[in-house]
Amino acid sequence: SYDNWELLLMDASPEWDAVSDLADDANDERVRRFELPGNGGIVLNTNACIQQATGDYIAFLDHDDILEPDALFRYVAALNKAAEGERPQVLFCDEDMFQKTGEWGQPVFKTQLNVDLLYSHNCVTHFLMVEKALIDRIGTSPEDVAGAQDYDLTLRCLASGARFEHIAHVLYHWRVHPGSTADGSADS
């Protein structure tokens, strides 16, 4: 496992105690909670968290999804393996779905970046980790891309000439539930 991380929790609904309880229960100074005056939606909430991040890289994790315990270790190993000046600026991995039944399924085994495929759909998706200096340079996502903010960020990273690296392990489990994008329903 990897110990040098911080977890930023954006509490856009402070009237509910779930996020503050989670931060308190963690009892770990690496877990930091921030409160917004109102729920600005996924893009504004994400952008506010990005502004609070202190690390060299920012990894995006949805509130209801699951990471393998060695995910950060594998990403950092890829960074450390690369020569200085050649480090990847955008990292992503294979993923699967965690079904409502409690079963794992539908693995997605990706390849190194395929630009043509990326222009047709978001073949990078999860577990997206981006160099903070790159985000500072290209900016955060605009509010009008809500629901596709990860894709927007990935495309803007590509347009900037960023170096991408695929980590060939299933490290991210996308939880399927009614209304989630993973569910494929019209409501998501």
Language-model segments: residues:
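A recurrent flexible, glycine/aromatic-enriched loop bordering the glycosyltransferase active site
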Residues: V43, Q51, F98, W104-A133
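Acidic donor-binding loop at a coil-to-helix junction in glycosyltransferase catalytic cores
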Residues: A146-L153
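The conserved acidic donor/metal-binding loop of glycosyltransferases
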Residues: A12, D62-I66, D94
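Acidic donor-binding segment of Leloir-type glycosyltransferases
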Residues: Y2-G38
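Short aromatic/hydrophobic "clamp" motif used to bind/position activated sugar donors
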Residues: I58
